[in-house]
Amino acid sequence: MKSLKAKFRKSDTNEWNKNDDRLLQAVENGDAEKVASLLGKKGASATKHDSEGKTAFHLAAAKGHVECLRVMITHGVDVTAQDTTGHSALHLAAKNSHHECIRKLLQSKCPAESVDSSGKTALHYAAAQGCLQAVQILCEHKSPINLKDLDGNIPLLLAVQNGHSEICHFLLDHGADVNSRNKSGRTALMLACEIGSSNAVEALIKKGADLNLVDSLGYNALHYSKLSENAGIQSLLLSKISQDADLKTPTKPKQHDQVSKISSERSGTPKKRKAPPPPISPTQLSDVSSPRSITSTPLSGKESVFFAEPPFKAEISSIRENKDRLSDSTTGADSLLDISSEADQQDLLSLLQAKVASLTLHNKELQDKLQAKSPKEAEADLSFDSYHSTQTDLGPSLGKPGETSPPDSKSSPSVLIHSLGKSTTDNDVRIQQLQEILQDLQKRLESSEAERKQLQVELQSRRAELVCLNNTEISENSSDLSQKLKETQSKYEEAMKEVLSVQKQMKLGLVSPESMDNYSHFHELRVTEEEINVLKQDLQNALEESERNKEKVRELEEKLVEREKGTVIKPPVEEYEEMKSSYCSVIENMNKEKAFLFEKYQEAQEEIMKLKDTLKSQMTQEASDEAEDMKEAMNRMIDELNKQVSELSQLYKEAQAELEDYRKRKSLEDVTAEYIHKAEHEKLMQLTNVSRAKAEDALSEMKSQYSKVLNELTQLKQLVDAQKENSVSITEHLQVITTLRTAAKEMEEKISNLKEHLASKEVEVAKLEKQLLEEKAAMTDAMVPRSSYEKLQSSLESEVSVLASKLKESVKEKEKVHSEVVQIRSEVSQVKREKENIQTLLKSKEQEVNELLQKFQQAQEELAEMKRYAESSSKLEEDKDKKINEMSKEVTKLKEALNSLSQLSYSTSSSKRQSQQLEALQQQVKQLQNQLAECKKQHQEVISVYRMHLLYAVQGQMDEDVQKVLKQILTMCKNQSQKK
């Protein structure tokens, strides 16, 4: 029977058996042959789950054993099988970056778009791990690139989040959505800016990522780039914003064209002279970006001829046009500076500084050229505003260069036009570059303004949260802070106004480009009113002197006009020297004023630094004051709660008194409602007796009337009988009968009415009797309410006692609350004391830390000395080793000598002396060997001791005795070295 049962027993294939364990072990070891043999056995399955939820198929994919996977696939394993976590073999291969396994699975028709429990595909895991080959294979097999997981992430977002820029490039090239967002509203650009991956940011911007998108918190990509503190990413974003703004609002070039037209009309130069701007070379770009690279180039022979003769006015006018354009562009930059926020103005002003410095250097070069040829025209370039006035005067003369040129001019008109073309083209190129830079700055300023607005919104929301607090002191603090903010804003505005005035002076030529670097950061400073007034006075003085310089320049220009008209008069040498000395004095005065202003500025900076330090100290004091204010607020809250408790207890007492009064009133009202007064009862009894007597009289009357009616009936019957006896006619008889019938009917009706009346009266009498009985019962019960009254009184007294006990309990609770408040106050005082103790402990701990640091430094120094000593000891050991080697060599020599002596002794039978000498030498050799062994032992012991001490010193566990010994050793070593 057992054999039959065994034959017909069905083997359960889902149960875990030994073959499955062996299969897992073979996959773990990567033994493909063993895997193939085990899969051929019954009961073994590659997709069977163990107790931990693992399968052999998934383990092979996770470990990257391609041969094992191939064997399993040939045995017909389910490729789409998932483990307990919802991962397929493809997911695990991608998660562990095994691209060969991914290729094998995809070739065996494993779906690339399969999703696990978190909504991720294999491409999600490959992108997150940064395996480019796996991503390429999955994309070749058309894995969905823009499929989102449960968190809203596409593979591009995961690649950017983990900083894999190569995969980001690849996915973007294969159609990944650049502006895709996750559930928190973040795009790939925001994530790249947050982690600071400049390569990913660059790739995303090239593929058209939208910089204006905002996440669920209201932050854009520029905000996250500031969090990462990567200047390269910030510059990339700002340049992209500026380019987008250029495409949207192409108004700036038109304004520039209008300015150029106006300047050309003022100068009066013919349109043919303006050559088209050449393409921007790298050298020019470097000239614009780095002001230090600009150097003054020497003039050629043709240019010297050109500047030596009167027609050089055309080039002066072109230079003035360029400078006018530059002044307009700088005014645009100044207006932008007012709009930008404090945080971004520093970066933008630093960029502007570089550009302004490069321009000023270029202008200096031109001025040097002019000064080399004509000092009068060089002085004419000192003020920027004077160019506009001179252009109108020089217009007609520039329009007729042939008439004004003297016959002794060496340069031809073609040379003049060529030199003018070169200068104008260079200047136009630089102006265009500056305009582009200014447009970039405008974009950056707009983006910074948007961020400033966001910050203001956050500030307002935080203020609203602060306002929600109950403490009035917090609101007072916030109002104080807002007042301080307003004051700082007003100071900031005043400082900005002064910056603008300084920049205007830059245009007038009063401020040097070197001082511009100092003034660029002036907007950060909060200057007091007295300093501002002093600076304003200095500026006014400088402006007055600039006006004087303008007048001098105008006089020079008038002289130039006279020279153009034909009166070519060469000034004498004395006048030229006087003019030169006057201009030198003016320049020296201006330099002195600049130095004075710079000193003032430095003093203001120092004072502002002091103010900042005081502000910081005030902020720390305010923080401590806020803690004290919070404590005071808590004390006030406790006092208010005590007051509320006392008020509630008073209200409770009043309510109890009212309750007692109400109960007394209610008891009286209930008694009066339930019982009738005796006088009222007697009146009611009298009324009922009277009504009863009346009813009895009415009854007697009704009975008498009834008897009368009966008598009349009897009489009538007798009459009828008599009439019957006496014969009467039928008609009369009928009449009599009808009359009698009617009379009988009437009488019957009267009788029925009387009966009804009697019944009603009897009912009334019964009611009155009932009332009498009830009144009698009430009268009998009138003696009972005293007991009930006593019961009520006792119950009320018990309630009063209960209420009194409750009152006592409430009073006790109040006392407990009061005691708790006292305890809380004492605890607060204890906390204060503990806080003070903790602060003292902190100070002491800090001192201990400082002492420990000093000790640690000393220990380090001692360690260094120990190391030196160890090095010296090693050197000594080396010397000892050398000596030992020498001794061993001597010993060998002695042994050889002994051997030779022994041979001689054998041969010549040496004397006893030689044998004694040999023995002595052997003893010396033994002694030396013993000394060597002892030295080695001592050396090893010293090394072990030093090692132990060094370890203890590193761990900070060196004993004081050891330190003293080490110090003594070091002093001994020093003394020995000094003696040597």
Curated annotation (Swiss-Prot):
Amino acid composition bias (Polar residues), ranges on this chain: 282-299
Region (Disordered): 247-301, 387-423
Induction of the gene: Up-regulated by all-trans-retinoic acid (ATRA) in retinal pigment epithelial cells (ARPE-19).
Transmembrane portions of the chain: none
ANK repeat coordinates: 18-51, 52-81, 85-114, 118-147, 151-180, 184-213, 217-247
Record flagged with keyword Acetylation: yes
Residue ranges that the Swiss-Prot or TrEMBL entry lists as coiled coil: 349-374, 425-947
Chain positions with Phosphoserine modification: 11, 281, 286, 293, 300, 304, 318, 327, 329, 340-341, 350, 358, 419, 512, 515, 667, 915
UniProt main location, coarse: cytoplasm
Keyword Electron transport attributed: no
GO-annotated cellular components: anchoring junction; cell cortex; cytosol; fibrillar center; nucleoplasm; stress fiber
Highest taxon in the source lineage: Eukaryota
Biased composition (Basic and acidic residues): 247-259
Ranges spanned by the short sequence motif Nuclear localization signal, renumbered to the chain: 270-276
InterPro entries membership: Ankyrin_rpt, Ankyrin_rpt-contain_sf, RAI14/UACA
Job of this protein: Plays a role in actin regulation at the ectoplasmic specialization, a type of cell junction specific to testis. Important for establishment of sperm polarity and normal spermatid adhesion. May also promote integrity of Sertoli cell tight junctions at the blood-testis barrier.
Oligomeric form and interacting partners: Interacts with PALLD. Associates with actin. However, does not bind F-actin directly.
Name of this protein: Ankycorbin
Organism from which the protein derives: Homo sapiens (Human)
Classification lineage: Eukaryota, Metazoa, Chordata, Craniata, Vertebrata
Gene name linked to the record: RAI14
